[in-house]
Amino acid sequence: MRQFNISVIGLSGTEKDRGQVGVGKSCLCNRFMRPMADDYFIDHISVLSQSDFSGRIVNNDHFLYWGDVRKTTEEGVEYQFNIIEQTEFMDDSTFQAFKVGKMDPYSKRCTATKVFSAEKLMYICKNQLGIEKEYEQKVMPDGRLSIDGFVVVFDVSPVPNRSVEKQVEFVQNVIATILKNKKPLVLVTTKNDDAYELYVREAEKISQRKDYKSTVQLIETSAHESINIDLAFLLLAQMIDKVKNRVKIISYQESAKSRKELLDTRSEAVTRLIRNQITDYHVLWSQGSKMLSQYREWNEFLNIFGHEAGQKLFRRHMKKLRDDHLNKKLHQYLDKFALALEYLLPDIGALNISDDDAWECARNYLQNHIEFEQYFFECPQASWTELVDMDEAEDEARIPFDVLETSEAETVFRNYLNSVQQDKKKIGWKQQFKMLLEESGFVTPGKQLSEVRVLFMGRECFEALSEHDCQQIYDIHQDDIIEKSKQNFVELLLEHAQYFLQFKNVDNITQEDVRQITDVIQEDSRYKMLDRLDQERRLMLVQHLRFIHCPIRDHCPFFYNCVDSLIEEVLSDKSASNHKTPSGGGWKSSGSGSDRTLNLLIVGSEHLASDLLNDIRICTGSKGEYIYENQTYYLNYRIANGDMEAFKAIDVYSSGLICVYSNQQSFETLKDNLERTLLCNLELEDKFENLPIVLVYQPQDLKENEVEYLRNEGMRLSEMLHCDFIDHTQNHQKYVYDILNIVILSLKLTEMKSYEPYPSNHTDLRILCCIFCGDQYDIENIVQPLVEESTLVKANEHSIIVDVFIGDAKRRVEFILSSYHGTSQYRDELIHGYIYFYSTKRRSSLANLSILAAQNANIPLQIIAVTESGGVNAFFNSDICQFLITEGNAVADRFKGSFMTFSADQYVKFAFYNPFLKTAWDNKYEVENLHVEESITLDSGEGTLENSVNQMPRPPPRHESYMLSNTLGTDGSGSENYEMAPTRSLNSLNEERDISLDEIYDDNEKPKHLHQKWLEDKSDGRRNMNKNLIWNNFSGSTHAYTTGRRHIDSNLNKIRPKGPSQTLKVGEAPSRNCPAMSSSTFTLPTQQPGKLNMKNFQLVSDAVAKMNFTGSGSGSGSGSGSGSTGLGLGLGSGSGCMGDSFLEPVDKDGKRYDHAQLDGEDEDSEELAEYEQIYENEDCTESDSCASSTERRVRQQNAYYKASKKPVAAKKQKKKKVAIPVQTPRVPPFGSYVSPPEIPLHYQRMAVGGSGPEKPEPCVPEFMKSDKSPEYSMVPELAGAGIFGAENLPEYNMNQAKCLKDFEKLEKRRIKEETARQRKLQEKEKEQEKKLKRKLKQNAKGLVESAEAQFGKLMITSEQGEIPIFLNKCVEFIEKEGLDSEGIYRVPGSRAHVDMLFQRFEEDTNTEIDALDIPVNAVATALKDFFSKRLPPLFSKDIIKELEEIAGSRGVGNSKLNVEVKTDRSCRLIALKSLLQKLPPINFAILKYIFQHFVHVSDNSKLNSMDSKNLAICWWPTLIPIDFTDMGHFEQLRPYLEDIVQTMIDQFPYLFCGKDAFVMV
């Protein structure tokens, strides 16, 4: 390593010689020797004291030794430098140069090539003088140095008292001397950061002098900026070393730019480092620097800028942190202040101020407000900025009042003031625009805004509002006028009640009927008003026809305001305060009279409960008062913020449980606690029974898919818990009111259900009070005189019993309150008098009254006209009122009844009804005798068919169909998730083609009141409890309740003829003898009003357009098969049990075929024997409902069922009828083909004549007695016109021999083809089995290891043979632990548990599930996953296609099966058994094992609510995997595949074990 001794020289001397400051020699040396910022000193002096001059550092010399340093070039060459600075020191006393020996001038002395100074120390800074020992001490080597080169300094900055000429002269003399001594040198200009351009050019001239011969290189430097310092010394070293490739000389501008970029980079890196690492403005410099010292960026910054710059940057960052914190806190206060303004100062007009002093007055107003301390606090000792640093202020949620002194707070107030004023203007404009729309006659229903926009141009209210606001107001107005127009149209239809009466008992409404109705009403303005909404108008007409045909509450156009519903509410409220009415459950609102207390428990994590409580308090005020339907409720709260232990100690007197969640974590916690609390202890006494629960979702700032997922999960949980679900985002403005309304309504419904019906067996009079739906008067005024009686006792939801004096004796009178349309259910009951109320403002009210009065003309009648307030004035002031009162009086005279008027605001007492009660009592015996005479004709004996098929039976009791709660039943009906599913089975696939009116709606779609969007498919929380009604399709015949449904017996005193049951008791041996029938001829049943599945149509117009307006009748209903025009909306009663009617063959001309009885039976075919064994049965006994197979099996095994049934009290007993095993016709959905109900001729059991006790004979047609072939069971039936009628099948004549011969040929050919096909399949299966055996022999490890290698350890067979061990253990565990678990297979288990279970079995097949502590629902889910994901499909694609054909889901044209098999249930059952026998043995064994498990589960359906229907719904997608192309295909196949699985469960002994089949119709 080369070592160089460099001497730095420049102009020196007194101020007269060098000017006020030096040329920068010391700074240049300092930066070169110690470049770090903390080691660089800018204050170097040449005026010293005598002591400093004589010290070891100066050592009485006029030069300084700066020490030695090592530098490396870019090429990696390393040099060592010893630096000498030649200067001239002045005496501080004389300001003259110190005299040291012989003194040469500085210009000559500085160019000396050798310097001597013994024991001279290294110079660092001026502070070192006098205290040398406190600094590093380094002695000049050997006390002498030979100078190798010179750095000549030229100052280019302007300095006072120094001329450039003097400096140029000095530099030129020095350079000349150095060149004479033949020493290398470089000319260095210093202070270029403050350079003067003239001086720079002078320096350049010096270096470019020709006599220097380019030996003088010019380097531009700046010691303060550390630019080109090393470059000057390295270049001099290379010149001394005579290196050819020297460093490149870079100009000052380029070096300065590079230096600036470096500094900026280091500064940004350190700034970013400090911002990331230092986030608390309380951190001290000592702590922060220690924390940052471990980072390279920080150390590099300190080297360049120094610690002082680092500390300055740190403190600047701390100040920014504090300012940010203050701004953040201020914004929080301002946000709270904005909310406080909305609450404390809702009306700016209350201030009565001008804009100038508004802010000052507002502050004074807030400071004097009564709730000031709730939102603000004052702290005179310190300002709010100082409070921020205090820990005590962190928990303070109120606003420091001195925040209002800031300009930002005033800005918030000004913005609030402007927004309030703008909102007032906007509200005014909206109101003006709404009034403009109401006053404009050209805005009609259905007209778009674009059509009338030009008419509003120039109006201020229209121009001021935005496009969105105008459209929103216009839409609201359209909704209002459309709703009003629909009400008027309904009113128009009701006014023509007399005309619509002719359609009441019509089975099929034709297109001509619709045209005639339209001709009658089309001239009315109320009809024309809906010209633009023709589809809705047409649908409303259809709905009205449906209501006329089946007048039940669900079809009432005033659904929510139906009188039947209002009466229930009124009687419930009135009876609640009566001491004779039993109290309800434990979850009640406390208090009595007009005030009640609601005790609410609010549960949620992460302060959600507290936030919800604050919202409730804001809505209910400080006193916690809430008014609902004129009833005041006082709210008490109890919250549990994440404390789910509150469930264990919950107060049984609470009124409702409100559960709130916002994210995945809070939902999982809430769901876990709810399930453990409400679902896991069902076998114990449930203290949460009837507890209203509301699930509230308040989403956080989540992604849209996460919000949608949590919303769906919440809705699924609410369905499982049978509670209500509220999404805060969808109705954030009034969701609190929705919560409180749901809790109160639930309590009311619970109280209504808790009232014990009062027996009404011994009443002296029964009076039916009829009120028309939609009348605009308060029903309470009518009911009040009755309920205020001290002897009042509530009999049921619609009747009360009052003890009253009639004449001289006290009589017990039952008042039945009903709507006009609800009177049909009391048609056959004994009623002693009718009281009809009608409104004097509605023509429709009187029109319907006239019809009802005509139907009961022989019974005492009281007509009461309800007028507006004003009494007599109402009669004279209103023409319509005068007309209707006069007409009502005339109706009363015509039917010999009494007439009275009743003012809506009139208070009357019970004596108001006394005159009519006296009249009813006087005519009691005549009415009862008349009732007995009429009742005798209803039924004449067993098995007769005298009742007309067009006679509509009465609906079931109101308390059954109207007040059934939407909860789990005890008869295995399953949860509400499955109650509304289609309940088809194999025996119900034969359906009539005509579509009845009830098909217009799904089971879960109900017509709503016109005010509540009657025509829209929307749900309403108020009626959630009544949405699943058992009797929602009741019309013309007794219902057949399919699998999974239940029927509750009536306990009212009613005379209702019961239709025969079509079910056989489980376990009875089917008989081959047929019961004798009273008649040899039968008629087709009428069809029940069905419902249109609106999900099959995207628009209402599609629904109306596809109503199947056909030109030919279907043969159903009247049984005539004539070609009359049919609308496709069958109004008959064919759905449900057949009742007293039976199918009969009808030929083309409408003639009936009579068949003689046959005897004998055929044993030639095993298939025929199975067919007959399934189809034939013993005499059927009458039952209350056509229940499911599971229900019948449970009833037969449970003796308590019969013992616990309450006898139905009836005024007139009827004989039991003999059940006829007829398939239950069902209404198919649009677009699917279903064949009509047919029964083979030889199974139609006909009596020879009479109804006497004759010996029953086998039911085989006479012309088939001698036939011994097995094919005679396949003779087709001709059932009138239709697909299988004379138009589509060969005409069936009475030439039996020819017909039978042709049929036998076809059947023999089919049997041969079937036999050959089966033989080929068997041969193919045998060949496959042989191949499989050969493969197994080749494998030394056997079948078990092969299965394990292919499918994993889960497929290892168990001890039971071919059953996988995983399947075996799961089934054993579920049957051991989960048969009593409610919703098994329906309630999913945890995915973590499922994955753990599979993992454990993969590791060890001998794993015991009991030891894993896994819930039974998780095991059930794992079992389903095993079938769907781990186990190969049990059914091949060909087998699945045959399953579809057997189920009847394919049309006849696409099916390989014949018509008989497609249309007959027993044939399909035999075909299903044959199909299962085609399965491979392993598949059949697994299928048999799992279905045997399903039988065990369904046998415990009373405990787990999973009967065969619900199991089929849960399992069919798993067992029968089909790739659906679209939803239409899925909806078409779903009911049939469900029935396949349900039948395999119900018929398990027959299909899998070879036993006799259960007969279910």
Curated annotation (Swiss-Prot):
Coiled-coil intervals: none
Pfam families: FF_RHG35_4th, Ras, RhoGAP, RhoGAP-FF1, RhoGAP_pG1_pG2
Organism domain of life: Eukaryota
Domain Rho-GAP stretches: 1349-1552
Chain ranges of the pG2 pseudoGTPase domain: 766-926
Site feature: Arginine finger: 1386
One GO cellular component term noted in the UniProt record for this chain: cytosol
Modified residues (Phosphoserine): 973, 975, 985, 988, 996
Modes of activity regulation: Negatively regulated by integrin, bsk and Src/Src64B.
CDD domains: pseudoGTPaseD_p190RhoGAP, RhoGAP_p190
Domain pG1 pseudoGTPase: 592-765
Keywords assigned: Coiled coil, Developmental protein, GTPase activation, Phosphoprotein, Repeat
Biological processes per GO annotation: defasciculation of motor neuron axon; mushroom body development; negative regulation of cell size; regulation of axonogenesis; regulation of cell size; Rho protein signal transduction
UniProt-annotated stretches for the region Disordered: 1054-1074
Keyword Phosphoprotein found: yes
Residues covered by the FF domain: 252-320, 365-419, 426-480, 482-547
InterPro entries attached to this UniProt entry: FF_domain, FF_domain_sf, P-loop_NTPase, pG1, Rho-GAP_domain, Rho_GTPase_activation_prot, RhoGAP-FF1, RhoGAP_dom
Protein task: GTPase-activating protein (GAP) for RhoA/Rho1 that plays an essential role in the stability of dorsal branches of mushroom body (MB) neurons. The MB neurons are the center for olfactory learning and memory. Acts by converting RhoA/Rho1 to an inactive GDP-bound state, leading to repress the RhoA/Rho1-Drok-MRLC signaling pathway thereby maintaining axon branch stability.
Protein name: Rho GTPase-activating protein 190
Organism: Drosophila melanogaster
